[in-house]
Amino acid sequence: MSRIGNKVIVIPAGVTVEVNGATVTVKGPKGELVRSFNENITLEIAENEITVKRPNDTKEMKMLHGTTRALLANMVEGVSNGFSKALEMIGVGYRAQLQGTKLVLSVGKSHQDEVEAPENIKFVVATPTSIVVEGISKEAVGQTAAYIRSRRSPEPYKGKGIRYVGEYVRRKEGKTGK
């Protein structure tokens, strides 16, 4: 059984947390995040720590307790340090380039795929085959990286496509001729 909800969240220096009913605003050096949580879950802020409390021990409240704590911890981490997800492109002629805030992908199609950067998300293209998605919201960074990967996910025969750095792509053997 998970006890993540019982862990205390430490607020680092330079980060402020405001609770207004069920809405929580977290401000830090990298930006500001606002999110609404279930009104049954209560947040207690004392000095530089946040404690998440649940009203009872029903299954639903236990689930919400852990989820709320994890989301809140990610908000605090995001506004203080930020999040990033690195992707690599493998394949002949597979390229990425920035045009303003837009990411332009050449991934073996008859046209180029353009990915517009969502709010609070930044793309970094160090080399034509590497992409880094940066932002303060862990959810938005992961979702954007997954969308970029979906433009050409790695195929199992040659391993070509866009993959996360360090991702293992399971390979298949090709057909055997007579």
Curated annotation (Swiss-Prot):
PROSITE patterns: RIBOSOMAL_L6_1 (PS00525). Keywords: Ribonucleoprotein, Ribosomal protein, RNA-binding, rRNA-binding. GO terms for biological process: cytoplasmic translation. SUPFAM superfamilies: Ribosomal protein L6 (SSF56053). GO terms for cellular component: cytosolic large ribosomal subunit. It comes from the Bacteria. It holds the Pfam family Ribosomal_L6. GO terms for molecular function: rRNA binding; structural constituent of ribosome. InterPro entries: Ribosomal_uL6-like (IPR000702), Ribosomal_uL6-like_a/b-dom_sf (IPR036789), Ribosomal_uL6_a/b-dom (IPR020040), Ribosomal_uL6_bac-type (IPR019906), Ribosomal_uL6_CS (IPR002358). Belongs to the universal ribosomal protein uL6 family. Part of the 50S ribosomal subunit. This protein binds to the 23S rRNA, and is important in its secondary structure. It is located near the subunit interface in the base of the L7/L12 stalk, and near the tRNA binding site of the peptidyltransferase center. This is Large ribosomal subunit protein uL6. It comes from Lactococcus lactis subsp. cremoris (strain SK11).
